[in-house]
């Protein structure tokens, strides 16, 4: 959940229209509630993607907080209204459909957080092999889409190798990154949905 705090913040800002500081506070309280309330145990990749699970629970958490706020303003004191969460089997019904919805802002932030987590996995492996400079150079071609015509020669010279060798390393790095990305999201989706989720994340990233 630490990794996905920013996507939660983005959803609170764009979907629920919270000001900056209120969104930060709400994101923190939501994550604490999710963890300490034991709700994470309800997340089951076989029944839906964790991305959808998290956004669904956030929407209902916000609705619950607003009901409590309204009750206090009405003078009825603090009351507890349980969040009416969707059943575990129909979470897919809340998947965003409109390409321009605030939910897409959440998905974009989710994608970037997931890519960062995958890059951190890969960076750690390169660090163990004393190859951080190579990591920084190679990730530019895979993640930042450097223009090959302008960059291969200078990058190869920087690493002290020829362009053919650099292209081979870029290709291997791309495969390793895809594997790191798959490993990052595997606990959050069913095996049957893994390829679809990977494709969706790449589409979000490339927009």
List where the protein language model places each region.
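Intrinsic, short, N-terminal disordered tails of RNA polymerase sigma-factor systems
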Residues: 1-207
């Amino acid at each position: 959940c630490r990794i996905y705090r920013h996507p939660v913040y983005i959803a609170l800002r764009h979907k629920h229209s919270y000001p900056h500081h209120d969104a930060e506070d709400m994101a923190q309280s939501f994550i604490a509630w999710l963890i300490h309330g034991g709700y994470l145990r309800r997340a089951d990749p076989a029944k839906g993607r964790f991305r959808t699970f998290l956004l669904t629970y956030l929407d209902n958490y916000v609705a619950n907080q607003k009901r409590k706020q309204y009750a206090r303003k009405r003078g009825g004191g603090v009351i507890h209204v349980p969040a009416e969460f969707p059943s575990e089997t129909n979470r897919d019904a809340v998947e965003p459909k409109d390409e321009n919805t605030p939910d897409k802002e959440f998905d974009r932030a989710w994608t970037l957080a997931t890519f960062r987590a995958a890059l951190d996995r890969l960076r750690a492996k390169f660090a163990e092999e004393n190859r951080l400079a190579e990591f920084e150079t190679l990730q530019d071609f895979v993640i930042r889409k450097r223009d090959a015509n302008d960059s291969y020669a200078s990058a190869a010279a920087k690493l002290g190798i020829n362009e053919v060798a650099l292209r081979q390393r870029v290709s291997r790095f791309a495969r390793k990154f895809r594997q790191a990305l798959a490993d990052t999201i595997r606990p959050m989706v069913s095996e049957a949905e893994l390829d679809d989720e990977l494709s969706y994340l790449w589409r979000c990233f490339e927009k």
